[in-house]
From Swiss-Prot:
Lineage of the organism: Bacteria, Bacillati, Bacillota, Bacilli, Bacillales
Entry protein name: Serine-protein kinase RsbW
Keywords from the UniProt entry: ATP-binding, Kinase, Nucleotide-binding, Serine/threonine-protein kinase, Transferase
CDD domains (alphabetical): HATPase_RsbW-like (cd16936)
GO molecular function: ATP binding; protein serine kinase activity; protein serine/threonine kinase activity; sigma factor antagonist activity
Function: Negative regulator of sigma-B activity. Phosphorylates and inactivates its specific antagonist protein, RsbV. Upon phosphorylation of RsbV, RsbW is released and binds to sigma-B, thereby blocking its ability to form an RNA polymerase holoenzyme (E-sigma-B).
EC class name: transferase
Gene: rsbW
Gene3D superfamilies: Histidine kinase-like ATPase, C-terminal domain (3.30.565.10)
Reaction equations catalysed: L-seryl-[protein] + ATP = O-phospho-L-seryl-[protein] + ADP + H(+); L-threonyl-[protein] + ATP = O-phospho-L-threonyl-[protein] + ADP + H(+)
Entry's family note: Belongs to the anti-sigma-factor family.
EC number, UniProt record: 2.7.11.1
Length: 160
């Protein structure tokens, strides 16, 4: 089991225009860790979906809140946690309503609104959703590709 190396945390207003800042930060962290271009794109899509869901569904117009994003940089993986303190939902029921999640079905067969959860589960190695007080989405992407450097901190990944 790998031990945590670095944590990077940020909070953004629950507004669509701030999701791009999360994507830029994620891209920089994943690039320095040695993820491939395709893996970085997968990470950006999945994390954008989680952030966009929080922005669209967590808060109402009168009660705009924040979205918290935490990057856990491990030697063999990147963990991203997206959390809000807004309205919760029953994830298991939602997933069942949205289905299908089997390889025999195509993305065209997903219910409307189900693409975000489907993408997160398809593009990431692990996805866990907690919906007790607000919603927390924890996603993990393992480093499968070749890395430039096998150091133990993000500083070791930098070339400058």
């Amino acid at each position: 089991m790998s031990t945590s190396v670095d944590y990077i945390e940020m909070k953004i207003p629950a507004e669509p225009e701030y999701v791009g800042i999360v994507r830029l930060t994620l891209s920089g962290v994943a690039s320095r860790m040695g993820y491939t271009y395709d893996d970085i794109e997968d990470l950006k899509i999945a994390v954008s979906e989680a952030c966009t869901n929080a922005v669209q569904h967590a808060y109402n117009d009168e009660n705009k809140g924040e979205v918290s994003v935490r990057f856990g940089v491990f030697e063999d993986r990147l963990e991203v946690i997206v959390a809000d303190q807004g309205d919760s939902f029953d994830f298991d029921q939602k997933q069942q309503d949205l289905g299908p999640y089997t390889p025999s079905h195509t993305v065209d067969q997903l219910s409307e609104g189900g693409l975000g959860l489907y993408l997160m589960e398809t593009l990431m190695d692990e996805v866990k959703v907690q919906s007790n007080s607000g919603v927390t989405v924890a996603m993990t992407k393992y480093l499968n590709g070749e890395r430039v450097d096998h150091g133990t901190t993000i500083k070791n990944y930098e070339t400058n």
